[in-house]
Amino acid sequence: LLMWNTSLDVFKQFTLAGVGTGDYDDVLTAKNESYGNSGVAKHRYNSHNQFLNTMVQLGLLGLVVLIMLFLNGFKMAYQQRNIIGILTLSCFFLNFLFESFIETQAGIILFCLLPLALFHLKPKAYL
């Protein structure tokens, strides 16, 4: 929760467009050092919340895009009666609350390709 509070404080300073993806670690580390969180600053921890990371990096605009990806995905899955798609997106959404999932290359690939593959399958209607 310490990192969540720090991330929210940084977001308040850079609300619209964020600090940028390249400056994220430096800005968060500097903010932690200014708060006296030397252990957190030393290890350069992120917030372990993808929504907060996106807010700090890309601002409100980036957060809106990320949320729209989920909303559009849920809408498509519901319209196609794709329960596997709904469950997959739900798992991603819950994971994003407690982990910075798309901060790594493996996370990006999984987040992009798995839903894409699931929405092109033609499952039986379960809903």
Give residue ranges: language-model regions.
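Hydrophobic transmembrane alpha-helices and their immediate junctions
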Residues: Q57-S90
